[in-house]
Amino acid sequence: MLTHTCLLQQMMDDSGIKNSDPDIYIYNIAPDLLTIHPDIDARRTHSINRFIEAPLEHKRTAYIMFHLLVDDLAHYGGISLKYQDGFDPHSSGYTYLRGRQLIESIMELHNIVGKNISYNEAAYRSHLIIEMVYDLVILSHIKRNGSIQLLEDAIHFTLDRKGNEFCADISWLYGIDESHVRDVLKMAASYITKERLDRIMNIEGRIRLFTDKFGLKNNNAVFAEAISTLFQNALSSIENEDFLQQTAVTIRNCGWLPTD
C-alpha cells in the first residue's frame, strides 16, 4: 500500500502536478482496499483490462489502472494489456524472483508448527513477504514524502468529501454495489491511521501482519526465531531501490498519464 502511494507521489511530482485532491491516493490503493469487504476478492479487483478508456466523468479510475500496472511489473515482469489468469510460481516478476530463495524456508517454517503447505502456496507467500518488506526498503522515501500521513488524510477526504464520486466510479469500473464501496471507505477510515501504520513499519510489525493473515500466531520459540530469520533474509535480498525507479520509467513509457 505504501509502496504504491510513494510511487504515485513520485509520478505526480515528475508530472509537475502539485495540488491534486488526495482522493487519487485512495483510487490508487482501491484494488487492494476493496478486498476488506467480505464479498469482494482480489481476482475481481485485479482482473480487468489495463487500458480501459474511461469517460470524462470517471477519469479518476486512471489511478486504479496505475496500481494495476505497478502490480503487473511486480508480479509478471511486464505490463499486460489484459489480466493474466492463473497462478505461475515461476513468474519472472520482481517479487517472485526475489521471493524464490525464501520458498524452502517458508515450507520449513510451516512444518515447525505442523502445518502443510504446497510449493505453489509457499511461492505465493514468498512474494507477499517481499512486498511487505519493500516498504521498509524505501522507508526513507516514505518518511520524506509524508506518505503515511497523506494516506490517513486521503481516506477521510474521500469518505467525507468525495464519497459519492468514488462509489460511482468503483461501481462503473467493477460493477460493485455502491453501498459495499461506502462500507469499505468507512472500514478503511478506522484502520488507515498514522498511529497504526507507524507501528507496523518495522520487521516485527511485518511479521505480525504475516502471521495474522495466515493464522500462524503461536508461542513456539523455534518458530519465532525462524520467521525472524526469514524476514531478515527477505530484507537482505533487496539490494537497492531500483524497482521503484524502473517501474516509474516503464509506466511513463507505456503512456500512462495523470488525469488532473
Question: Which ranges hold each PLM region?
Answer:
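N-terminal leader/auxiliary helical segments
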Residues: 1-260
